[in-house]
């Protein structure tokens, strides 16, 4: 599987111990969610087809909170390490993140891009293509002067999808290729595609 996901937040070294075997530390929200502020500044019409996801890799925190003054808001993290609720623009600018986890834990955060298309047995090919195009343009915008190094997205991966195929406007069908065992749809390779079809809905969609 090609790697067009960014490991952006680097390592967060946790500090003050709070109980045996556990530590927590406050860090600026921007350190945990880099580029989220820039994403939120993109006009909504230019980010209507995709959404960013921040995923803790290797080590997952036991708890994560957004801290604004005396207020704490929990930020759920799923079993895969993905943060399920992201701060808004004001919270990113002013808030802090309280990270709680194992003693002396260090974390890395990966930024992924996901289409705003619900996983289903049949999905509109044009919507998937639009998500890839928007995410590619946004990656260049987020990278700024380093746009030459920004990921060049070309398709969508379907983890958990089985027997994927493209159905064209003329009714023709073609099997989706596998990228290290995961079905992949590259819009540029399938002009005239109408829908992407699976025997069962994939678990997730990932722009890559």
Give the residues covered by each predicted segment.
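Noncatalytic modules at the cell exterior or secretory-pathway interfaces
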Residues: 88-103, 187-199
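N-terminal export leaders
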Residues: 3-8
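Glycine-rich, aromatic-bearing surface loops/beta-hairpins
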Residues: 139-208
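Extracellular ectodomain segments of secreted/surface proteins
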Residues: 23-56, 121-158
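N-terminal signal peptide c-region/cleavage motif recognized by signal peptidases
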Residues: 15-20
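Sec-dependent signal peptide hydrophobic core
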Residues: 11-12
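Short acidic/polar inter-strand loop motif in beta-rich domains
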Residues: 101-118, 201-206
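N-terminal Sec/ER secretory leader and immediately downstream segment
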Residues: 22-94
